[in-house]
Amino acid sequence: MPRSLKKGPFVDEHLLNKVDAQNEAGTKQVIKTWSRRSTILPDFIGHTFAVHDGRKHVPVFVEDSMVGHKLGEFAPTKTFKGHVKDDKKGRR
C-alpha cells in the first residue's frame, strides 16, 4: 500500500540537511548514507549519493526519472553470479 498523500514523502532529516547545505554552498560532493528508505526529492537531482548495500557504498547519481523512488532501489543488496551450466560430461 502506498504512503498517504497527506503525510508526504519520507526523507531522513540528516540527509535533507546535507543536501540543503550543499545546495546553498553550490557544491556537488558525494553524500554517504545508510538511509535506503528515503524518498528521492526534486532537490536531490544532480547529486551523487553513496548508498550502503550492506557491504559497501554504491554510488547513485540522481536524475529526473528517479524522483519519487527510494534510494535503496538503485543499490542492489544481492549479487547474482549466474546459473551454473549443467555439464554432466565434466563430472566424470
UniProtKB/Swiss-Prot annotation:
Presence of keyword RNA-binding: yes
GO CC terms, sorted: cytoplasm; small ribosomal subunit
Pfam families documented for this protein: Ribosomal_S19 (PF00203)
Domain of life where this protein originates: Bacteria
UniProt keywords, alphabetically: Ribonucleoprotein, Ribosomal protein, RNA-binding, rRNA-binding
InterPro entries: Ribosomal_uS19, Ribosomal_uS19_bac-type, Ribosomal_uS19_CS, Ribosomal_uS19_SF
GO biological process, one term: translation
GO molecular function: rRNA binding; structural constituent of ribosome
Protein function: Protein S19 forms a complex with S13 that binds strongly to the 16S ribosomal RNA.
Recorded family membership: Belongs to the universal ribosomal protein uS19 family.
Protein name (record): Small ribosomal subunit protein uS19
The organism's taxonomic lineage, starting at the top: Bacteria, Bacillati, Actinomycetota, Actinomycetes, Mycobacteriales
Gene: rpsS
